[in-house]
């Protein structure tokens, strides 16, 4: 490999950089094509990040997982594949994104400095400050805004009102499933019955409607707590084999494994000590940006 020298090194690897494959029996036996979503194989699927996966037009595809990544992938897969099986253990809460083109007249009306003001308001929102819908108005901030409104009206304890606000939000999301998915049995399987932040909330305007397509089938594996096995030709779930040409793993990333394993590169400080040894008793840094003994090394995420 190449050897490079630099005065400053910035680590922008983030916590989710090592893909995690599920421990499904037989995963190595599959003779079709397979890949993890973060290692998307466009040579096989065709198309690009915005869809148009023409290489799947004659393929039966399975995607395992229905988390935040799958919510983004499923609409394009359903649109392009001959047949799509979506294997779901626990449904995600999928709220409306309501993404739309920016109104040119509105954009022209913005005063100089609006970007900085929006950044300030966004920071305040995440620190628990007041949320101004004129600057930040999305699904992430709506729950907090609704909770604050309830507290102001009643004066009751925050914890009890938080549960009420959360329930109302989730009821709205479950109602969206009923309004969108035509088959009541499929709709029921797609409903999330838990607090909104039990799993990462998702927002998409096309995911739920994808299950109205004739070429898309939701395979609920909640009873068996996941896919049972993978064979040479497909996936076994609920005692049934689903022959497929391609398996896509939307199974997330390693989060709780060691930092050394996730980063995958050795880092030594001025005393010859590795950063992993330095952090054996726990990660510590200055403002989450610099580490004593490792000059000119910056942590950016």
Task: Name every feature range the model reports, one short phrase each.
Residues 1-34, 38-39, 43-44, 49-58, ...:
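N-terminal FAD-binding dinucleotide-binding subdomain shared by FAD-dependent oxidases/monooxygenases
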Residues 73-77:
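Aromatic pocket-lining residues of Rossmann-like dinucleotide-binding sites
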Residues 70:
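N-terminal Rossmann-fold NAD(P) dinucleotide-binding loop
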């Amino acid at each position: 490999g190449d050897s490079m020298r630099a005065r400053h090194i910035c680590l922008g690897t983030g916590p989710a950089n090592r893909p995690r494959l599920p421990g499904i029996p037989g995963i190595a036996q599959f003779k079709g094509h397979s890949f993890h979503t973060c290692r998307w194989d466009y040579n096989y699927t065709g198309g690009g990040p915005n869809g148009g996966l023409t290489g799947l037009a004659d393929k039966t595809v399975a995607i395992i997982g229905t988390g935040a990544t799958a919510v983004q992938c499923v609409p394009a897969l359903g649109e392009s594949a001959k047949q799509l099986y979506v294997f779901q253990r626990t449904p995600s809460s999928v709220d409306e994104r309501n993404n739309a083109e920016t109104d040119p007249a509105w954009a022209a009306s913005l005063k100089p400095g609006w970007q900085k003001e929006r950044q300030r308001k966004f920071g305040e929102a995440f620190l628990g400050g007041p949320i101004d819908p004129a600057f930040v108005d999305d699904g992430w901030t709506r729950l907090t805004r609704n909770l604050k409104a309830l507290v102001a009206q009643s004066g009751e304890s925050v914890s009890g009102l938080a549960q009420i606000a959360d329930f109302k939000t989730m009821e709205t999301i479950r109602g969206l499933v009923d309004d969108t998915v035509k088959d009541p049995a499929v709709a029921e399987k797609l409903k999330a019955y838990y607090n909104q932040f039990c799993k990462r909330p998702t927002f998409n305007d096309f995911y739920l409607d994808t299950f109205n397509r004739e070429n898309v089938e939701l395979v609920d594996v909640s009873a068996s707590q996941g896919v049972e096995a993978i064979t040479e030709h497909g996936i076994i779930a609920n005692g049934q084999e689903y022959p497929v040409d391609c398996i896509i793993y939307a199974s997330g990333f390693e989060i709780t494994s060691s930092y050394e394993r996730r980063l995958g590169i050795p880092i030594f400080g001025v005393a010859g000590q590795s950063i992993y040894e330095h952090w054996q008793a726990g990660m510590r840094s200055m403002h989450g940006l610099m580490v004593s003994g490792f000059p000119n090394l910056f942590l950016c995420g």
